Amino acid sequence: MSASASQMDYVLPNELVDGMIAAGGKKATVSVKNLLIRGFYSGAILGLAVILALTVGLTTKMPFIGSLLFPFGFASIVLFGMELVTGNFALLPMATWAGRSTWAATFRNWAWVWIGNWIGTAVVAVIMAISLTSGTMDGAADNVGAPIWDAVAQKIMALNKANVVTKYENLGGMGFFLAFLRGVVANWLVCLGVTMALVSKSVPGKLLACWLPITAFQSMGMEHIVVNQFLHTAGPILGSGVNFGQVIVWNWLPVTMGNIVGGMVFIGMLFYSTHRTKVANVLPTEHDDKLERELAAELGAR
């Protein structure tokens, strides 16, 4: 295969970064209505992905299988160009550093997309809470014989209590710091997955590239704010006994902060610093404006 043919499905790193910068700049100008609609979709689909992962994990007694299927939610967000606040934690700062946006526009985007993501997760949480407590799947049972839907509901409540009270609130300041650190790792991996998907121009390439880091994040049990918006909204609705004040202070706040650092520093800043400047004899100096526009559109900046 010739070099030109082999590069048809591959976006060079400097071109990728230019596309990410352009996308961040365009995202900064998206209307509040579209931020909320696209954010709603992303939150809703991740809520459904969590239910899928838990159901499959409990049914098969193999949680890794659930983690392996979980990334379908992120894949659809990438393919449809929706708004996920954790991805924007990397893109908007890159645009600001390049002079394509401002910090005011960045914070505006983050706030509205965060709200849109939460609305999406909350709607799915209410729907699933009703569904999980109002019926059973014939013939499907967990390891103690309870109907699988009841087992999923119990698992959500257990995760809600463990990831707010047991792991964090009970440890005080150290717990807050641990939630922050796990948020850093989670969004480092998630943004890596989204960025890897953009390196390929083919749908199969995008799916494979984004699947691996996101499966890793899910398997490691790290903290992603949009996933947590679903779990820690559904948990109290189902009756976990955890209140939303505890959720905000001991999970959503430190995890959001950690996700910002993971995306902005470990993906945005590092990629911007090393690939924004084209290196002679390593990366081509010719800039592909068409590719930049394509990448910007692909990242949801339409």
Which residues fall in each region the model found?
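Alpha-helical transmembrane segments and their helix-helix packing motifs
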Residues: S2-R302
